[in-house]
Amino acid sequence: MFLAYPSSRELVTLATSADSEQNFSDGEVMAMLTELEVNGKRYPVNYPADTPLLYVLRDELGLTGSKYGCGEGQCGACAVLIGGAPRRSCQIPVSAAAGKPVVTIEGLEKDGRLHPVQQAFLDAGAFQCAYCTSGMIMSSVGLLQTNPNPSQADIVQFLQGNVCRCGTHPRIIDAVRQAAKMMREQGR
């Protein structure tokens, strides 16, 4: 089963209330030109300010690693790093991401080498259907940036907002611990 979400182009024609400050005719929402820094590159994007960052990443930039799960910020499938911290891109308006570095799952790999968290997830087999994996990895990277030697309780607490319906949490926890060790050994 695939979850559908409105395309960002469909959002441009969403109806606004009659008493809106923006007074647009025919119920259109005005798009605005914004510059995003994603995975170290700058992109001009033209969307309504309240368009979820997830839609812009997927529809405009073609970065489909971040997944649409619930659209309510409850599952973590859409997690990206904004300013180094994990955030739910389905809940972040594109205007709030302007001027801040955004990193998606596609931006973790460097020079053909996986990030230690990505490698640890592969080594531990920390996925089944893999729908949640990019969000789990991005949240784990955020954790390890702030806590390079987390306990099992720290990992469980930090990832409690990421849902894995396949039940691979024990392997995910093992992967985060392995990644922490690799990162310490590499001096990251």
Model-derived regions, located:
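N-terminal export signals
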Residues: M1-S8
